[in-house]
């Protein structure tokens, strides 16, 4: 395909046909399990507070709103889906567009397809098993292996991420020739993420999908803290062939604690010179009303299709990437 023929799709028609078949297979997977498909808004008056996520922002001007209302394209359908769960919908899944104003490349596009689902009364491990079932069905891969975050660091970096101080983390970074970044970084979780990305990720999920679970409590996000070890959160991620595929939680149900985490995120944003984000009060109200004990996971569909087709880039499985949109 000529590089100048930008009117043409980035993916081939045969690949788009295969993609459609995978989307249908995903829907059958959940239909067979009695999980309800839902649709939620792509825009919201509130957004994520995570310091590592950057949402797109737009402005609505219409009848009754002459001054305009700020709206954010959703980075994930999580908040709306939790409101449905609190309203009593039962197990749900969604295939939807999500948007992040971040990088673009082989594994990233600002607009992408997300598969997100929630299972009331599932703990983290039971949901991990279901994710594994889906991956085996779509990718025809081996059953996954599982490592705790602590085990992964000890195996590949010979350091305990739960007890190491910042000096020890910088020493580990120096062994990876990352001192130019690590020596000026004061945030411990950013150091851990640097080590994980550069020192752990390249070694996991080569032959089979790998679950990494029990992330540090400081990286809990919207996950519960483990009742067995308060140093870790009931959160997991899935990696396969160099790609992060999914991120899941045993979901936090405490509205007050969730609000405190959002506020802490905004304080971190302010310290880094980033804009503070509006907190989703509707989500907090839903948690206060009673979110059922549940686990949920978000999975990147474009990356899943890329792996299933043996493609080299998301551009091979997306009809029009952002540079052709």
Curated annotation (Swiss-Prot):
GO terms for molecular function: acid-ammonia (or amide) ligase activity; ATP binding; lysine-tRNA ligase activity; tRNA binding. One of its GO terms (cellular component) is cytoplasm. It catalyses: D-beta-lysine + L-lysyl-[protein] + ATP = N(6)-((3R)-3,6-diaminohexanoyl)-L-lysyl-[protein] + AMP + diphosphate + H(+). InterPro entries: Aa-tRNA-synt_II, aa-tRNA-synth_II, aa-tRNA-synth_II/BPL/LPL, EpmA, Lys-tRNA-synth_II_C. ATP binds at residues 100-102, 109, 244-245, 300. Homodimer. Belongs to the class-II aminoacyl-tRNA synthetase family. EpmA subfamily. This is Elongation factor P--(R)-beta-lysine ligase. It comes from Salmonella typhimurium (strain LT2 / SGSC1412 / ATCC 700720). The gene is epmA.
């Amino acid at each position: 395909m000529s590089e100048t023929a930008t009117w043409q799709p980035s993916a081939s028609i045969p690949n788009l046909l295969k993609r459609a078949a995978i989307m249908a297979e995903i829907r059958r997977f959940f239909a067979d399990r009695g999980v309800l498909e839902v649709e939620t808004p792509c825009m919201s008056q509130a957004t994520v507070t995570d310091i590592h996520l950057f949402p797109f922002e737009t402005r609505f001007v219409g009848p009754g709103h002459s001054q305009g209302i700020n709206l954010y394209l959703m980075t994930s359908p999580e908040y709306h889906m939790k409101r449905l769960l609190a309203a009593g919908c039962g197990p749900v899944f969604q295939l939807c567009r999500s948007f992040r104003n971040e990088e673009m490349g082989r594994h990233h596009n600002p607009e992408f397809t997300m598969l997100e689902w929630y299972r009331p009364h599932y703990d983290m491990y039971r949901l991990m098993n279901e994710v594994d079932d889906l991956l085996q069905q779509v990718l025809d891969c081996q059953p996954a292996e599982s490592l705790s975050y602590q085990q992964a660091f000890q195996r590949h970096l010979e350091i305990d991420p739960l007890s190491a101080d910042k000096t020890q983390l910088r020493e580990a970074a120096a062994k990876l020739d990352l001192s130019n970044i690590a020596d000026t970084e004061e945030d411990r979780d950013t150091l851990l993420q640097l080590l994980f990305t550069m020192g752990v990720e390249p070694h996991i999920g080569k032959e089979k999908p790998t679950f990494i679970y029990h992330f540090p409590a400081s990286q809990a996000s919207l996950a519960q803290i483990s009742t067995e070890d308060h140093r870790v959160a009931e959160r997991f991620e899935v990696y396969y062939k160099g790609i992060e595929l999914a991120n899941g939680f045993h979901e936090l149900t405490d509205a007050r604690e969730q609000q405190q985490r959002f506020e802490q995120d905004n304080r971190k944003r302010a310290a880094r010179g980033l804009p503070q984000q509006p907190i989703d009060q509707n989500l907090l109200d839903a948690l206060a009303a009673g979110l059922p004990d549940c686990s949920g996971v978000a999975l990147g569909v474009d990356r899943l299709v890329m792996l299933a087709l043996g493609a080299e880039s998301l551009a091979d499985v997306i009809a029009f990437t952002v540079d052709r949109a």
